Amino acid sequence: AQARLLNRLASEKKQQAVIHIKYDTGFHRIGFPDCPESLDEIRQICSMPWLKPEGIYSHLALKDDQSNQVQFRCFMDAVNELESEGCHFRYKHIADSIAAVDFPEYRLDMIRAGAIVYGLKGFHKGQLDIRQALTFKTRISHITPVLKGQGVSYDYLWTAPQDTRVAALPFGYADGYPRNLRGKAMVTLRGKQVPVIGVICMDQCMIDLTDVPEAQIGDQVIIYGDGSGNTLDIDAVSRLAGTNKNEIVARLTRRPPRIYVRGNDSGTGYSSAERMTP
Protein backbone atom coordinates (compact mmCIF):
# COMPACT_ATOMS: atom_id res chain seq x y z
CA ALA A 1 0.00 0.00 0.00
CA GLN A 2 2.79 2.44 0.84
CA ALA A 3 4.62 1.64 -2.37
CA ARG A 4 1.50 2.16 -4.49
CA LEU A 5 0.82 5.48 -2.78
CA LEU A 6 4.40 6.62 -3.25
CA ASN A 7 4.32 5.53 -6.89
CA ARG A 8 1.15 7.58 -7.45
CA LEU A 9 2.57 10.67 -5.75
CA ALA A 10 5.80 10.39 -7.75
CA SER A 11 3.74 10.05 -10.92
CA GLU A 12 1.83 13.23 -10.11
CA LYS A 13 5.08 15.11 -9.62
CA LYS A 14 6.64 13.49 -12.68
CA GLN A 15 9.70 12.61 -10.62
CA GLN A 16 10.89 9.09 -9.87
CA ALA A 17 11.12 8.29 -6.14
CA VAL A 18 14.37 6.66 -5.02
CA ILE A 19 13.73 4.09 -2.29
CA HIS A 20 15.44 1.48 -0.13
CA ILE A 21 13.44 -1.64 0.72
CA LYS A 22 13.63 -3.08 4.24
CA TYR A 23 13.71 -6.89 4.46
CA ASP A 24 13.13 -8.28 7.96
CA THR A 25 15.48 -11.20 8.59
CA GLY A 26 14.63 -11.63 12.25
CA PHE A 27 14.83 -8.32 14.09
CA HIS A 28 11.03 -8.13 13.88
CA ARG A 29 10.73 -4.36 13.91
CA ILE A 30 9.81 -3.17 10.42
CA GLY A 31 10.22 -4.50 6.91
CA PHE A 32 8.95 -7.25 4.66
CA PRO A 33 8.88 -10.55 6.58
CA ASP A 34 11.03 -13.38 5.26
CA CYS A 35 8.57 -15.35 3.12
CA PRO A 36 7.82 -16.03 -0.58
CA GLU A 37 4.87 -13.61 -0.52
CA SER A 38 7.21 -10.79 0.44
CA LEU A 39 9.47 -11.52 -2.50
CA ASP A 40 6.43 -11.34 -4.77
CA GLU A 41 5.54 -7.93 -3.34
CA ILE A 42 9.09 -6.67 -3.79
CA ARG A 43 9.06 -7.82 -7.42
CA GLN A 44 5.89 -5.79 -7.93
CA ILE A 45 7.55 -2.75 -6.36
CA CYS A 46 10.52 -3.14 -8.69
CA SER A 47 8.13 -3.02 -11.64
CA MET A 48 6.41 0.22 -10.59
CA PRO A 49 7.42 2.88 -13.15
CA TRP A 50 7.78 5.81 -10.75
CA LEU A 51 9.79 3.98 -8.10
CA LYS A 52 13.52 3.39 -8.27
CA PRO A 53 14.54 0.73 -5.71
CA GLU A 54 18.11 1.89 -5.24
CA GLY A 55 18.79 -0.29 -2.21
CA ILE A 56 17.65 -3.17 -0.06
CA TYR A 57 18.64 -3.64 3.56
CA SER A 58 18.13 -5.48 6.82
CA HIS A 59 19.21 -5.12 10.45
CA LEU A 60 21.03 -7.56 12.73
CA ALA A 61 19.86 -8.35 16.25
CA LEU A 62 23.52 -8.99 17.21
CA LYS A 63 22.55 -11.72 19.66
CA ASP A 64 25.49 -13.96 18.81
CA ASP A 65 27.61 -15.05 15.87
CA GLN A 66 25.31 -17.89 14.89
CA SER A 67 22.15 -15.80 14.78
CA ASN A 68 24.02 -13.08 12.87
CA GLN A 69 25.05 -15.64 10.26
CA VAL A 70 21.49 -16.93 9.97
CA GLN A 71 20.19 -13.41 9.39
CA PHE A 72 22.93 -12.56 6.91
CA ARG A 73 22.36 -15.75 4.93
CA CYS A 74 18.62 -15.13 4.92
CA PHE A 75 19.20 -11.62 3.58
CA MET A 76 21.62 -12.67 0.86
CA ASP A 77 19.39 -15.55 -0.25
CA ALA A 78 16.50 -13.12 -0.70
CA VAL A 79 18.67 -10.57 -2.51
CA ASN A 80 20.20 -13.16 -4.82
CA GLU A 81 16.78 -14.53 -5.74
CA LEU A 82 15.42 -11.06 -6.47
CA GLU A 83 18.44 -10.05 -8.54
CA SER A 84 18.31 -13.28 -10.52
CA GLU A 85 14.82 -12.26 -11.58
CA GLY A 86 15.69 -8.73 -12.68
CA CYS A 87 15.42 -6.71 -9.46
CA HIS A 88 18.80 -5.01 -9.25
CA PHE A 89 19.92 -2.94 -6.27
CA ARG A 90 22.82 -0.52 -6.28
CA TYR A 91 23.18 -0.76 -2.52
CA LYS A 92 22.77 -3.78 -0.26
CA HIS A 93 23.38 -3.09 3.42
CA ILE A 94 22.98 -4.89 6.73
CA ALA A 95 25.90 -3.66 8.88
CA ASP A 96 25.63 -1.02 11.59
CA SER A 97 28.66 0.30 13.50
CA ILE A 98 29.21 -2.91 15.46
CA ALA A 99 28.72 -5.33 12.58
CA ALA A 100 30.90 -3.26 10.25
CA VAL A 101 33.88 -3.68 12.59
CA ASP A 102 33.29 -7.15 14.01
CA PHE A 103 32.14 -8.76 10.74
CA PRO A 104 33.88 -7.14 7.73
CA GLU A 105 32.19 -9.59 5.37
CA TYR A 106 28.84 -7.96 6.22
CA ARG A 107 29.85 -4.54 4.88
CA LEU A 108 28.57 -5.27 1.36
CA ASP A 109 27.97 -2.01 -0.58
CA MET A 110 27.25 0.29 2.34
CA ILE A 111 27.47 0.50 6.12
CA ARG A 112 25.19 2.46 8.42
CA ALA A 113 27.64 4.20 10.74
CA GLY A 114 26.00 5.56 13.87
CA ALA A 115 27.71 5.46 17.27
CA ILE A 116 31.09 4.90 15.67
CA VAL A 117 30.93 8.42 14.19
CA TYR A 118 31.13 9.73 17.76
CA GLY A 119 34.05 7.43 18.52
CA LEU A 120 31.91 5.13 20.65
CA LYS A 121 33.16 1.55 20.73
CA GLY A 122 30.42 -1.05 20.78
CA PHE A 123 32.32 -3.72 18.89
CA HIS A 124 34.04 -6.64 20.61
CA LYS A 125 36.03 -8.59 18.04
CA GLY A 126 37.32 -6.10 15.53
CA GLN A 127 40.15 -3.66 16.13
CA LEU A 128 39.71 -0.03 15.22
CA ASP A 129 41.75 2.82 16.66
CA ILE A 130 39.16 5.49 17.38
CA ARG A 131 38.78 8.12 20.07
CA GLN A 132 35.60 9.50 21.57
CA ALA A 133 34.79 12.65 19.61
CA LEU A 134 32.24 14.21 21.95
CA THR A 135 32.89 16.36 25.01
CA PHE A 136 30.03 17.88 27.02
CA LYS A 137 31.06 21.05 28.87
CA THR A 138 29.55 23.87 30.87
CA ARG A 139 30.71 26.62 33.24
CA ILE A 140 29.97 27.48 36.85
CA SER A 141 27.15 30.01 36.89
CA HIS A 142 26.82 30.60 40.64
CA ILE A 143 28.56 29.70 43.91
CA THR A 144 26.88 29.74 47.30
CA PRO A 145 28.17 28.90 50.81
CA VAL A 146 26.42 25.97 52.50
CA LEU A 147 26.79 25.26 56.21
CA LYS A 148 27.16 21.83 57.77
CA GLY A 149 23.76 20.13 57.95
CA GLN A 150 22.09 22.35 55.35
CA GLY A 151 20.36 20.64 52.43
CA VAL A 152 20.73 21.15 48.70
CA SER A 153 18.06 20.83 45.99
CA TYR A 154 14.65 19.14 46.21
CA ASP A 155 13.79 17.14 49.33
CA TYR A 156 17.24 17.86 50.80
CA LEU A 157 18.42 14.43 49.67
CA TRP A 158 21.96 15.73 50.11
CA THR A 159 23.05 17.58 53.22
CA ALA A 160 26.45 19.12 53.75
CA PRO A 161 28.70 16.98 55.98
CA GLN A 162 30.75 20.10 56.70
CA ASP A 163 30.81 23.79 55.82
CA THR A 164 31.47 24.04 52.10
CA ARG A 165 30.65 25.88 48.90
CA VAL A 166 28.23 24.59 46.29
CA ALA A 167 28.37 25.55 42.61
CA ALA A 168 25.38 25.66 40.29
CA LEU A 169 25.87 24.47 36.71
CA PRO A 170 23.43 25.69 34.03
CA PHE A 171 22.34 22.33 32.67
CA GLY A 172 19.95 19.63 33.80
CA TYR A 173 17.72 16.80 32.68
CA ALA A 174 16.04 19.05 30.08
CA ASP A 175 19.42 19.11 28.35
CA GLY A 176 19.61 15.32 28.35
CA TYR A 177 21.53 14.64 31.56
CA PRO A 178 20.03 11.55 33.24
CA ARG A 179 18.26 12.47 36.47
CA ASN A 180 19.17 9.14 38.05
CA LEU A 181 22.84 10.17 38.17
CA ARG A 182 22.10 11.91 41.47
CA GLY A 183 24.65 10.82 44.04
CA LYS A 184 26.64 8.84 41.46
CA ALA A 185 28.12 11.14 38.85
CA MET A 186 31.32 13.11 38.98
CA VAL A 187 32.32 16.05 36.79
CA THR A 188 35.78 17.46 36.20
CA LEU A 189 36.74 20.90 37.50
CA ARG A 190 40.31 22.21 37.38
CA GLY A 191 41.56 18.69 36.72
CA LYS A 192 39.78 17.14 39.71
CA GLN A 193 36.66 15.02 39.86
CA VAL A 194 33.95 16.57 42.02
CA PRO A 195 30.56 15.03 42.89
CA VAL A 196 27.17 16.02 41.52
CA ILE A 197 25.02 16.51 44.61
CA GLY A 198 21.32 16.73 45.34
CA VAL A 199 18.48 16.11 42.92
CA ILE A 200 19.34 17.06 39.33
CA CYS A 201 16.95 19.84 38.30
CA MET A 202 15.39 20.54 34.93
CA ASP A 203 17.78 23.36 34.03
CA GLN A 204 20.50 23.16 36.66
CA CYS A 205 22.49 20.83 38.85
CA MET A 206 24.87 21.37 41.73
CA ILE A 207 28.36 20.21 42.61
CA ASP A 208 30.28 20.18 45.90
CA LEU A 209 33.40 22.37 45.85
CA THR A 210 34.97 20.95 49.02
CA ASP A 211 37.96 19.54 47.12
CA VAL A 212 38.32 22.57 44.83
CA PRO A 213 38.07 25.57 47.17
CA GLU A 214 39.72 27.84 44.60
CA ALA A 215 36.90 27.37 42.06
CA GLN A 216 35.33 30.53 40.67
CA ILE A 217 32.26 31.53 38.71
CA GLY A 218 33.01 31.00 35.02
CA ASP A 219 35.31 28.02 35.54
CA GLN A 220 34.92 25.35 32.87
CA VAL A 221 33.39 22.06 33.98
CA ILE A 222 33.59 18.90 31.88
CA ILE A 223 30.45 16.84 32.34
CA TYR A 224 31.88 14.00 30.31
CA GLY A 225 34.74 13.74 27.86
CA ASP A 226 37.01 11.15 26.29
CA GLY A 227 38.38 9.81 29.57
CA SER A 228 41.58 11.85 29.46
CA GLY A 229 42.47 14.56 31.95
CA ASN A 230 40.57 12.87 34.79
CA THR A 231 37.25 13.14 32.95
CA LEU A 232 34.49 10.55 32.89
CA ASP A 233 33.90 9.15 29.43
CA ILE A 234 30.50 8.20 28.03
CA ASP A 235 31.09 4.55 28.95
CA ALA A 236 31.42 5.47 32.62
CA VAL A 237 28.40 7.78 32.57
CA SER A 238 26.24 5.15 30.87
CA ARG A 239 27.19 2.53 33.47
CA LEU A 240 26.32 4.91 36.31
CA ALA A 241 22.98 5.70 34.65
CA GLY A 242 22.21 2.02 34.04
CA THR A 243 21.92 2.38 30.28
CA ASN A 244 24.13 2.21 27.18
CA LYS A 245 26.38 4.72 25.46
CA ASN A 246 24.04 5.35 22.56
CA GLU A 247 21.22 6.45 24.85
CA ILE A 248 23.45 8.93 26.67
CA VAL A 249 24.32 10.59 23.36
CA ALA A 250 20.76 10.39 22.02
CA ARG A 251 19.42 12.05 25.18
CA LEU A 252 21.22 15.31 24.39
CA THR A 253 18.55 17.80 23.44
CA ARG A 254 18.77 20.76 21.09
CA ARG A 255 19.40 23.21 23.92
CA PRO A 256 23.15 22.69 24.42
CA PRO A 257 25.00 24.50 21.60
CA ARG A 258 27.13 22.27 19.39
CA ILE A 259 30.65 23.40 18.56
CA TYR A 260 32.30 21.42 15.77
CA VAL A 261 36.10 21.29 15.69
CA ARG A 262 38.77 19.59 13.63
CA GLY A 263 41.23 19.58 16.49
CA ASN A 264 43.77 22.14 17.64
CA ASP A 265 47.46 22.55 18.33
CA SER A 266 47.23 20.65 21.61
CA GLY A 267 45.75 17.66 19.85
CA THR A 268 42.88 17.41 22.32
CA GLY A 269 40.16 18.25 19.83
CA TYR A 270 38.55 20.51 22.45
CA SER A 271 37.03 23.75 21.27
CA SER A 272 38.58 27.00 22.43
CA ALA A 273 35.24 28.79 22.13
CA GLU A 274 34.03 30.31 25.39
CA ARG A 275 30.37 29.31 25.53
CA MET A 276 28.15 28.18 28.35
CA THR A 277 25.63 25.36 28.31
CA PRO A 278 22.78 25.71 27.71
Regions found by a protein language model. Give the residues of each.
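C-terminal accessory subdomain/extension
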Residues: 145-278
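Active-site loop/helix belt of alpha/beta enzymes
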Residues: 4, 8-18, 24-147, 213
